[in-house]
């Protein structure tokens, strides 16, 4: 949201030494970085609660997190196959971080980190690098053969197309998430300014749906990209 609590502004100023809350308010980057730290703290706290006194018969937070992770593991297995299960921790971390980041923006006084292009670009570039590192590790130098095309005389045509397609992946991942989350924030802000009591409620409910959909899309595309790098290079 665009009107943080006074306490949150004070905390931001304390975290970024040498800056006042007013100065930080002029730079949305610092606000999103601070909320990113908050999301990480929430995930660490949930993880500690889930693993504290963990038992064979799960209960409470352990039961909830096991249900969430089992669902994510099923999606990873269905999309990437058994060979892709080694990347389950990466995909699960992405999914949990994105979901909490998207949902936190629905709380008045908080801004979703995913409404910043910097956050989304960092995640998208990370997926891009992992994809090609996996490809090289699995297939060696043969991984780059699929950039050249099936026959050598098609290389001048296929190579630029493949390069543009791969370079567009982090761009599309980051811009899609940024556009949806930032756009929803703007719409919600407008509704709050017009009718601050009841009218924003449907938009907030839609925001929950958008948060889950955007998390799923980012996670699914990441799995598809990495699974493509795992396949036999042709």
UniProtKB/Swiss-Prot annotation:
TM region positions: 29-49, 90-110, 116-136, 147-167, 186-206, 207-227
Superkingdom: Bacteria
One GO cellular component term: proton-transporting ATP synthase complex
InterPro entries reported for this sequence: ATP_syn_F0_a_bact/chloroplast (IPR045082), ATP_synth_F0_asu (IPR000568), ATP_synth_F0_asu_AS (IPR023011), F0_ATP_A_sf (IPR035908)
Biological process annotations from GO: proton motive force-driven plasma membrane ATP synthesis
Keywords for this protein: ATP synthesis, Cell inner membrane, Cell membrane, CF(0), Hydrogen ion transport, Ion transport, Membrane, Transmembrane, Transmembrane helix, Transport
UniProt key word Protein biosynthesis: no
Compartments where found: Cell inner membrane
Membrane topology: Multi-pass membrane protein
Subunit text: F-type ATPases have 2 components, CF(1) - the catalytic core - and CF(0) - the membrane proton channel. CF(1) has five subunits: alpha(3), beta(3), gamma(1), delta(1), epsilon(1). CF(0) has three main subunits: a(1), b(2) and c(9-12). The alpha and beta chains form an alternating ring which encloses part of the gamma chain. CF(1) is attached to CF(0) by a central stalk formed by the gamma and epsilon chains, while a peripheral stalk is formed by the delta and b chains.
Protein name: ATP synthase subunit a 2
Species of the source: Syntrophotalea carbinolica (strain DSM 2380 / NBRC 103641 / GraBd1)
Taxonomic lineage: Bacteria, Pseudomonadati, Thermodesulfobacteriota, Desulfuromonadia, Desulfuromonadales
């Amino acid at each position: 949201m665009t009107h943080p609590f006074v306490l949150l502004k004070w905390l931001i100023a304390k975290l970024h030494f040498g800056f006042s809350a007013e100065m930080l308010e002029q730079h949305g980057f610092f606000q999103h970085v601070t909320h990113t730290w908050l999301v990480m703290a929430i995930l660490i706290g949930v993880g500690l609660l889930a693993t504290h006194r963990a038992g064979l018969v799960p209960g409470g937070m352990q039961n909830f997190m096991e249900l969430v992770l089992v669902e994510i593991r099923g999606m990873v297995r269905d999309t990437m196959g058994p060979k892709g299960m080694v990347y389950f921790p990466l995909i699960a971390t992405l999914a949990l971080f994105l979901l909490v980041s998207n949902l936190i923006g629905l709380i008045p006084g908080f801004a979703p980190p995913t409404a910043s292009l910097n956050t989304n670009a960092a995640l998208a570039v990370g997926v891009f690098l992992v994809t090609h590192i996996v490809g090289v590790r699995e297939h060696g130098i043969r991984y780059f053969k699929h950039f050249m095309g099936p026959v050598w005389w098609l290389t001048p045509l296929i190579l630029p197309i493949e390069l543009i397609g791969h370079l567009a992946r982090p761009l599309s991942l980051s811009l899609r998430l940024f556009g949806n989350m930032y756009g929803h924030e703007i719409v919600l802000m407008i509704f709050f300014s017009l009718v601050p009591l009841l009218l924003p409620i449907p938009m907030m409910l839609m925001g929950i749906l958008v948060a889950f959909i955007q998390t799923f899309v980012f996670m699914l595309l990441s799995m598809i990209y990495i699974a493509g790098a795992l396949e036999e290079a042709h």
